[in-house]
Design a protein with these regions (language model features):
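N-terminal cap/lid segment of alpha/beta-hydrolase-fold proteins
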Residues: 23-67
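Mobile cap/lid helix-loop segments that gate and shape the active-site cleft of serine hydrolases
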Residues: 35-40, 185-215, 221
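Short beta-strand element of the alpha/beta-hydrolase
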Residues: 69-80
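Catalytic nucleophile-loop/oxyanion-hole region of alpha/beta-hydrolase
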Residues: 85-89, 93, 100, 105-142, ...
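Primarily recognizes the serine-hydrolase "nucleophile elbow" in alpha/beta-hydrolase
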Residues: 129-193, 208
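Short beta-strand/loop motif that positions the catalytic acidic residue
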Residues: 225-227, 231
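Conserved alpha/beta-hydrolase "acid-adjacent" motif
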Residues: 232-238
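C-terminal catalytic histidine-bearing segment of alpha/beta-hydrolase fold enzymes
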Residues: 247-295
Length: 295
C-alpha cells in the first residue's frame, strides 16, 4: 500500500509540475504525441523564414502519404491575445488538419508590446504571400488556399479575408483565399474594454478600422464562424453578429455554437485526446475542403 501511495503521489506531483512548467497549448502538443495523435501526418519544414526583415518564421505540415494530385492548403493562425503564443506549441493543430488532407502552414507573427495594430495583420499577409510563392514545393495547390485561426488568430484570419488592403499590399493576387474559418475570434469588440484589446489597438486613430465586421462584404469568400456557448473570453456575440452581417449582405456564411464549450475548449477539441468535446475539427475541415474547390 505504501508503494502504491508513493507512485500515486509521484504521478500527482509530475502532473502538477507539467501544468505549471509547460504552456497550455504545448501541453496539448505533448499529450497529442503521447497518444500517437494523427500519426498519418508530419512536419515537413520547420523554421522557414518568410519575412527576413522581422525574423518571422513558419512551419509546414503535410500528410505522410501524398499522391500525384496537389493538396488543399490551410494557413492557420494561433491565438494568444495578440501578446502571447508561438507556432511550436500548436503542432497538434498542424498535424490534425494535415491528417485531414491539407498542407498546413503555421506562421508566427509579431505581438504586443513589440508591435500593435496593424502589424500582426501585415505579418499574416506576408505569410500568405509566402504560401502563394512557395506552397507548390510542398505539394500544396496555390489555387486551393484557405485560412483559419483561433482567438486572436481568428481575428487575423478574418481581417486578411475581409479587408482587402493587407493581402493586396503584400502582393497576393485577388481571390487567392478560397474560404476562411474563425474559431472563437473577436470580430466586433468596440469599445476596447480589456487590457489586451486596449494595448493592441488603443493608439489607432479610427477604431472602426480595427474591426473585422466593418469590412464584411457580399463578395467575401465563404466564411464559417465557430464559438462555444460558454466562451467568457471572446463572447459568442462576435460570431453571431459576424454571421448575421455577412448574411445580410448576401455572402456565404455558416455559424455554429458548440454547447457548453469554453474559449479554450474550442482549440482543445482539435487535439486528439479531447475531440469528444465537439466536432470542431471535422466541421471546419469539411467546410474548408468543400469550399477550396469552388470556382
Amino acid at each position: 500500500m505504501k508503494i502504491l501511495f508513493t507512485v500515486v503521489a509521484a504521478i500527482v506531483v509530475a502532473l502538477f509540475a507539467f501544468t505549471k512548467l509547460v504552456a497550455p497549448p504545448n501541453q496539448l502538443n505533448i499529450l497529442n504525441t503521447l497518444m500517437l495523435g494523427d500519426s498519418s501526418a508530419s512536419r515537413v519544414a520547420e523554421g522557414v523564414v518568410f519575412d527576413k526583415a522581422n525574423g518571422m518564421k513558419l512551419d509546414v505540415w503535410a500528410p505522410k502519404q501524398k499522391g500525384a494530385a496537389k493538396l488543399p492548403v490551410l494557413v492557420f493562425f494561433y491565438g494568444g491575445g495578440w501578446y502571447a503564443g508561438e507556432r511550436a506549441h500548436y503542432g497538434f493543430v498542424g498535424k490534425a488538419y494535415a491528417a485531414k488532407g491539407f498542407v498546413v502552414v503555421m506562421p508566427d507573427y509579431r505581438k504586443v508590446p513589440k508591435v500593435r495594430f496593424p502589424e500582426f495583420n501585415k505579418d499574416g499577409a506576408n505569410a500568405v504571400r509566402w504560401v502563394q510563392d512557395n506552397v507548390e514545393k510542398f505539394g500544396g495547390d496555390p489555387k486551393r488556399v484557405t485560412l483559419a485561426g483561433h482567438s486572436a488568430g481568428g481575428y487575423i484570419a478574418m481581417m486578411l479575408t475581409l479587408d482587402r488592403q493587407y493581402l493586396r499590399d503584400a502582393g497576393v493576387v485577388p481571390g487567392f483565399v478560397r474560404a476562411t474559418v474563425g474559431l472563437a475570434g473577436p470580430y466586433d469588440f468596440l469599445p476596447f474594454d480589456s487590457v489586451r484589446s486596449i494595448n493592441a489597438f488603443y493608439q489607432w486613430p479610427k477604431p472602426i478600422e480595427t474591426q473585422p465586421i466593418a469590412f464584411a462584404r457580399a463578395d467575401a469568400p465563404p466564411i464559417m464562424v465557430l464559438t462555444g456557448t460558454h466562451d467568457d473570453t471572446v463572447k459568442p456575440r462576435n460570431a453571431i453578429l459576424m454571421a448575421r452581417r455577412l448574411h445580410e449582405l448576401g455572402a456565404q456564411a455558416e455559424f455554429k455554437a458548440y454547447p457548453y464549450l469554453t474559449h479554450e475548449d474550442l482549440i482543445m477539441a482539435i487535439s486528439k485526446p479531447f475531440r469528444s468535446k465537439g466536432t470542431v475539427l471535422d466541421d471546419s475541415a469539411m467546410f474548408l475542403l468543400e469550399n477550396s474547390r469552388r470556382n
